[in-house]
Amino acid sequence: MGVTGILQLPRDRFKRTSFFLWVIILFQRTFSIPLGVIHNSTLQVNDVDKLVCRDKLSSTNQLRSVGLNLEGNGVATDVPSATKRWGFRSGVPPKVVNYEAGEWAENCYNLEIKKPDGSECLPAAPDGIRGFPRCRYVHKVSGTGPCAGDFAFHKEGAFFLYDRLASTVIYRGTTFAEGVVAFLILPQAKKDFFSSHPLREPVNATEDPSSGYYSTTIRYQATGFGTNETEYLFEVDNLTYVQLESRFTPQFLLQLNETIYTSGKRSNTTGKLIWKVNPEIDTTIGEWAFWETKKNLTRKIRSEELSFTVVSNGAKNISGQSPARTSSDPGTNTTTEDHKIMASENSSAMVQVHSQGREAAVSHLTTLATISTSPQSLTTKPGPDNSTHNTPVYKLDISEATQVEQHHRRTDNDSTASDTPSATTAAGPPKAENTNTSKSTDFLDPATTTSPQNHSETAGNNNTHHQDTGEESASSGKLGLITNTIAGVAGLITGGRRTRREAIVNAQPKCNPNLHYWTTQDEGAAIGLAWIPYFGPAAEGIYTEGLMHNQNGLICGLRQLANETTQALQLFLRATTELRTFSILNRKAIDFLLQRWGGTCHILGPDCCIEPHDWTKNITDKIDQIIHDFVDKTLPDQGDNDNWWTGWRQWIPAGIGVTGVIIAVIALFCICKFVF
């Protein structure tokens, strides 16, 4: 009778019943009592989505270009690996595109390569192109190579990023970072996303240690640059080098440099001293500092791990070459029978090092190295006066044979790569150690005869301040080069990306925990970073809203803690954001092509409007929640009473919903009884 009676109600009673039902429904909507349908009110269409439905092409001021560094995705940044990505080619003109903001780089490069005939391999930078302004380490490579081509291009199609200009070629003596150019789509209200910021900050702003900006230059010597037989030497000073045969982190090189200085293992004459690193040594110590004062080394190199070995370089001795005594005057071309002074035992106890205007003292290591030698053949090189002299070439073998368990300790929390830069020496052969040649030492076997040689062509400081000077950059149109924004790398959107950072054995997990831009004043304006289409290989991809401040929890949480759930969400976010970005770009391109006919909406009508919703905020919130619940917090004790209350409390919303449904049914039943 209940159902039949309701269907046969008179019109006035039916109206009263319907009125009470609508009151219940409105009551439920007001107090959000669930009736079995879940509504997510947090999914909102933002201003960027509204741009898609305009009937005309919006202003190009809504597009902003950003340079993203390849190292953010884990490409190898050591010099031997990085240079393999570059190659010479002729017949292709260089292309330049300007960008508005650049990401702070951990590793930058500066090349000065000559051909065997002495001519330059790389072209000079055109007017307006200056070095990349934010580099933690600048790897400065000098040397020779065949250079079979007019320009050096990136084999993978990426750009070489300079100061607000990205070029397809490398310019001589100009610091650059590898990267790609990405474009942001900003709503009209955000058109000043990159506000007018000075192209060059005041000098005192960069020299202030508290600003966190300082740069360390690491120098190298290269032979056969650009070939498969390229050899690299890390320059400790103008006469002391380390042969690079494997991947080295900048932190390792700085630690090695400090050890060489403090243990007195530099060349003490005008001869050239080369060290060689044992392949068994872990050369991947350290982690990405990214301008933060924090612990970034797993351990320090101890002088107990160092031992000298004299090796033969395959050259023949020159007959008739008579040994002579050594003079401290670098201009004296004489030989000596005692080669102990090649590595002085009595180096200064305090070595002054410089890092962006700051001076720090590096004290002696407590224990000196154990040194043993064996005979070697001597090379012959022409001296400055065109005379031939024997050149001693030593190699240092770094081994861990003398390691003791108690010596395996980590560095202090305040030890950073910036606090242990390579020591600065004056140009030319050091003279302080030459005054101590009379002191006996039993580190080296005096049987081997050495000869000094002037080596002033490589004079220079290993660690120098990376200075940023020059006038304002001109726009790409003033460079006399072909300007192309996308063509050089647009074909690399697919196929050239590395999926994750390369894993290094026995090293701390590496990631880029911070994202710094050196032209924007408002980090909180990172809302536009969710819509980056990136061009070129191995780009890091999408930086979403809010990651400027919580990227430690998102990016490092993904890579270091290997949270598969978080990784899956991040990949899903990346894929959906790419699709959304490309759909917006395609729509704007269609609007541009159809502008003369009134635009897309004029032709298609209301059907033209599409709204590719941005779920970035929701996904990032879920990622944050996962990290908060499963990473940052320890699991509670299951026997705790609070857990029972928490577990019972989470049923409250469902209980309220069920109660609301029961009340509605009872009220409906009462109304029907009252009516009948």
From Swiss-Prot:
Q: Give the region (Receptor-binding) as residue ranges.
A: 54-201
Residue numbers on the Extracellular membrane side = 33-650
From the record, give the cysteines joined by S-S bonds.
C53-C609, C108-C135, C121-C147, C511-C556, C601-C608
Name used for this protein in its record: Envelope glycoprotein
Region Mucin-like region: list its residue ranges.
305-485
**Additional free-text comment from the UniProt record:** Filoviruses entry requires functional lipid rafts at the host cell surface. Essential for infectivity, as it is the sole viral protein expressed at the virion surface.
The family assignment reads: Belongs to the filoviruses glycoprotein family.
